[in-house]
């Protein structure tokens, strides 16, 4: 199966893309390093009005969960991880990422009209590769993200039942 065949359905893509956009804004805000409570964040926004985020972002719990999933899956490919961060956290366009990728690309063995040889990839090739890498990254991330969100909901339900049970035992 080729990389171009790894596609999500429209609904899957919209679900994952929505969460990754919220996560990207959360990472960009710096909350990954200093896990702020929402009270502190609101206070900081009132003190520093220029630092107000205009992008919607997820809460700290969702951000940490998504970061754990992304880190666990994307550690395999540092380049794909960098492209994912550039696109979702920094808000870079695919064209801008491809342009940087093109500028820093080293010559590699490629087939072309002149035959096989060592060439620097064209900007169009870089754009296609960035598209393919992002699509493959989303495909690889989808199922672990689904599992993480489902497991978290189950854990919350179990915690609620366990706390209730513990309260009943302590009251006896």
PLM regions: where:
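Residues within the helices of the helix-turn-helix
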Residues: 95-99
